Structures are given as C-alpha cells and as structure tokens.
A protein has these predicted regions:
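Short glycine/serine-rich loop segments
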Residues: 114-155
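Basic nucleic-acid-binding alpha-helical/helix-turn surface characteristic of O6-alkylguanine DNA
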Residues: 1-114, 162-176
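Active-site phosphate/pyrophosphate-handling residues
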Residues: 87, 129, 158
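…primarily DNA-binding HTH/wHTH and HhH modules…
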Residues: 140-176
C-alpha cells in the first residue's frame, strides 16, 4: 500500500457490522457496529486485502464470536496519537486473554502512578477496540466501568466471562 493510502473494510460479527481502517503503517482504527459501519462495503473473497488485514479481521470476528484470540501481532498505525496514549495502548496490549488489570495498574506500569483517570480517558478514546483490549481494564477492586461497545458494560462483562478472567468465570459471549 502506498504512503498515505488507506483501506476501509467492513465485516459482520456477532455484535453487528464492524469495520477497520488500514494504512501503510497498519491498523488505524476499529469501528464497532453503528449505522455508519452498516453502510460500508463488506469483506468478500473478491476484495483484495493483505494476509495481515484478513488475519486481523478474522481475529476480531473470532473474539466477538466467543473465541479467545491473541491480537498482539496486529501492527498499529499510531500516527497522530500522543506519547501518553501510545504508552497506555501498549501496556493494555500486554494484558492476555483471561487476565484483567485496573486503570491504576496501567498507570503505574507506564510511570504515572496517579494517572488512573488519565488512563481511563485514553481508553475511552481507544481507536483500536478489541485489538487494544480495553475490555480487560477494570476499575479499582475489579469494578466494571466504561465500555462503548453495543451492550456497554454487559458486553464487557460477557467478554471477560468468556475469557475466564478472575472473578468473572466463563460463559458464552452471546446466547443463540
């Protein structure tokens, strides 16, 4: 892909139609279902995409289908993202499926021990949901807070249950 070119690809998931924006640097954003994503052209066998783009889409679909998947292989296009948010997203990507961290844990891990609220703000504007697994970040004492995906906190809780996160058990992400 040439410098500054981008590709937007929509695909169907259990949550609805999601989309990714991909550039020469990698994944630039993930869009969770909305009226706007429903109108985009869908991924098909006829659409020419790289193996990395296809693997990223397959990984996101797998996670939203209830399959535990590790998406740390996905290259991120972080141009325009400030160093603090980059650090938050990098730290969040280290949280493996089945694990959780608090906003305070992330803040301490990036050298900002009093920055839990700033971490929360950074994750609230996470342009890479699912790939940067903000659903694995919880409030102090494991309290569920903020999640912008359809279904909000209930979806966050189901995703954590599916992954077997401590205190959340395991359960099917979406029932029939």
């Amino acid at each position: 892909m040439d410098t500054n070119q981008q590709m937007i690809v929509a695909f169907d998931t259990q949550l609805g139609t999601c989309a990714i924006r991909w550039t020469d640097e990698g994944l630039a954003s993930v869009r969770l279902p909305s009226a706007r994503t429903a109108e985009l052209p869908r991924l098909s066998d006829a659409l020419s995409v790289s193996d990395e783009v296809r693997a990223t889409i397959e990984g996101i679909v797998a996670v939203l289908d209830g399959v535990v998947a590790d998406l740390r292989f996905v290259a991120l296009d972080e141009r325009g993202i400030d160093p603090f948010r980059r650090a938050v997203y990098a730290a969040t990507r280290t949280i493996l499926p089945g694990a959780i961290a608090t906003y305070g844990d992330i803040a301490r891990s990036i050298g900002r021990p009093d920055g839990a609220r700033d971490v929360g703000s950074a994750l609230a504007s996470n342009p890479f949901p699912i790939v940067v697994p903000c659903h694995r970040v919880v409030g102090a004492n494991g309290k569920l807070t903020g999640f912008s995906a359809p279904g909000g906190l209930a979806t966050k809780q189901r995703m954590l249950q599916l992954e077997g996160a401590p205190g959340f058990g395991q359960q099917v992400l979406f029932a029939g």
